[in-house]
């Protein structure tokens, strides 16, 4: 997925949201890993809202890999969102 930014910033679609939508639309379930990339100076992990959505889709052991042009860092979603929940 990719970020889609609008003038009304609350309508912006995060790359993770777009990736989740494509994943589900393709009939997939239970992802093992998701990678995010930025051209910035620091590898950046998903925001809290996206982490919660990823937690609900992939569970507490989902691996998140954050990369920039120089490095990659890997964490489980439980490390990034220790209080993730399912209803």
Where are these regions (language model features)?
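Short linear motifs in exposed loops
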Residues: 1-2, 76
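Short, well-ordered amphipathic alpha-helices
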Residues: 19-20, 51
């Amino acid at each position: 997925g990719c970020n889609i930014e609008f003038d009304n910033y609350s309508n912006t679609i995060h790359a993770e949201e777009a990736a989740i939508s494509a994943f589900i639309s393709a009939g997939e379930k239970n992802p093992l890993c998701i990678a995010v990339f930025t051209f910035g100076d620091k590898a950046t992990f998903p925001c809290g809202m996206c982490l919660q959505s990823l937690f609900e889709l992939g569970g507490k052991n989902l691996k998140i890999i954050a990369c920039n042009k120089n490095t990659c860092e890997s964490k489980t979603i439980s490390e990034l969102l220790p209080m993730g929940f399912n209803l």
